[in-house]
Amino acid sequence: MITVALAKGALLKDSVARFAAAGLDFSAVLDKDNRQLMVPTPCGRARALLVRNGDVPTYVSYGQAQLGVVGYDVLKEHQLPVAQLVDLGFGGCRMSVAVKASSGYQRALDLPAHCRVASKFTHCAREYFDSLDLPVELVHLNGSVELGPITGMSEAIVDLVATGRTLRDNGLVEIEELFRSSARLVGHPLSMRLDDGALTEIVTAIRAVEPSKGEA
């Protein structure tokens, strides 16, 4: 049986739709009354593991799931050995540096050396500031990173931005974009190499599906 790791939250609905177009019905995971974390398809051909977004590449890299759907931001942050198979085109956002609108900073290089930068994505942030040769102190936060500059704990943040509304509502502005992110279909490398054709069939079917307007 093929096991697919699906992230709870914002990517789930579009992930289910994409697999449905490829012939795998995981719609039961969308049932508000569902409490199962391992959900088989009605045909018994595959099963879905419902996991946190950040855990998808872990399940795939260890081979507990042969396929998974996860944001590129998570892949870049965790750097786990998974095969990136398809850019699915939904869940679009960007990783950005943001500061208080009143700070006067116009770009990342305006930030003072050794200033504090708050982020959930400290690996991505470190890689970016190292590329600028700008030493900063990174403060890891698990949520509401916007509070860093608001409270004065940090000069800036590095975080995902979709519409930018949360930043605006909290008096912050973007000054740099690190990279663009979207949902990716990933695979367990060894499983893909030893595939008898079943995984390739699914990947090919998913790749052939054009993103709907609702997904883009």
Curated annotation (Swiss-Prot):
- Gene Ontology CC entries for this record: cytoplasm
The pathway noted for it is: Amino-acid biosynthesis; L-histidine biosynthesis; L-histidine from 5-phospho-alpha-D-ribose 1-diphosphate: step 1/9
> Looking at the keywords, is Cytoplasm present?
yes
Q: Which residues form a coiled coil?
A: none
Any one GO molecular-function label of the UniProt entry: ATP binding
Q: Does the keyword Cytoplasm apply?
A: yes
Q: Tell me which EC number(s) this protein carries.
A: 2.4.2.17
- Which top-level enzyme class is recorded in the Swiss-Prot or TrEMBL entry? transferase
Matching entries from InterPro entries are given as: ATP_PRibTrfase_cat, ATP_PRibTrfase_CS, ATP_PRibTrfase_HisG, ATP_PRibTrfase_HisG_short
Cited Pfam families:
HisG
Which HAMAP family does the entry link to? HisG_Short
Question: What's this protein's function?
Answer: Catalyzes the condensation of ATP and 5-phosphoribose 1-diphosphate to form N'-(5'-phosphoribosyl)-ATP (PR-ATP). Has a crucial role in the pathway because the rate of histidine biosynthesis seems to be controlled primarily by regulation of HisG enzymatic activity.
Q: How does it assemble?
A: Heteromultimer composed of HisG and HisZ subunits.
Family, per the entry?
Belongs to the ATP phosphoribosyltransferase family. Short subfamily.
Identify this protein by name. Answer: ATP phosphoribosyltransferase
Q: Give the organism the record lists.
A: Synechococcus sp. (strain CC9902)
